[in-house]
Regions:
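Terminal amphipathic alpha-helical/low-complexity segments used for targeting or macromolecular assembly
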Residues: 1-61, 167-177
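Short, T/G/N/S-enriched strand-turn elements that build extracellular solenoid repeat scaffolds
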Residues: 64-65
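Left-handed beta-helix
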Residues: 72-73, 77-86, 91-92, 96-98, ...
Length: 177
């Protein structure tokens, strides 16, 4: 049934209860942090309730981010698939675009480690036992399968290699969640 046939009810509901991409991402961020808090403080019942709510929203929007994996300032730029291995380590103020993956390279011990300020572009994959330095920007559809030791650079390509000296510090990070 269209909005016109509903007498404008749908548009009124959208005005009163706006649900935008930012609202969903903010809700995910709050649930992720609440789940981490209650899990770390060993509030068993609250932790279970938060985990159920978190897993529902993660499955609905394909945001598979494990608890206690990311530092403060995590930014998910858009709703879409974001996949992280359960043992991955992500530093502070990192940003992820849609369709990104931080995954193991064959064994569960070989997981990526991202330092502070890393920006992961659309469709990028960080694969295996890889260490990515501070303020590195990973380009769209890049596959990072080797360590990136130099700070504040941009890498792109398959396999990823340095393409410029402008890294995550130069990235537009006005979008805060």
């Amino acid at each position: 049934m269209s909005e016109k046939n509903m007498g404008g009810t749908a548009s009124v509901i959208r005005e009163v209860f706006p649900i935008s991409e930012n609202d969903v991402l903010r809700k995910h961020q709050v649930l992720l942090r609440k789940t981490e808090y209650h899990t770390n403080c060993q509030h068993k019942v609250r932790a279970i309730i938060c985990k159920i709510k978190l897993y529902r929203i993660q499955n609905k929007y394909a945001l598979h981010i494990p608890i206690n994996a990311c530092g403060r300032g995590l930014k998910i730029m858009h709703i879409g698939p974001v996949l992280m291995n359960g043992r991955v380590t992500v530093g502070k103020d990192c940003s992820f675009h849609i369709n990104t993956a931080l995954v193991a390279g064959g064994t569960s011990d070989d997981v990526p480690c991202l330092e502070d300020g890393v920006v992961v572009g659309i469709g990028a994959v960080v694969l295996g036992n890889v260490h990515v330095a501070r303020n590195v920007a990973i380009g769209a559809n890049a596959v990072v399968n080797k360590n990136v030791a130099e700070e504040n650079i941009a890498v792109a390509g398959v396999p990823a290699h340095k393409v410029s000296n402008g890294g995550g510090l130069n990235w537009n990070k006005n979008r805060l969640i």
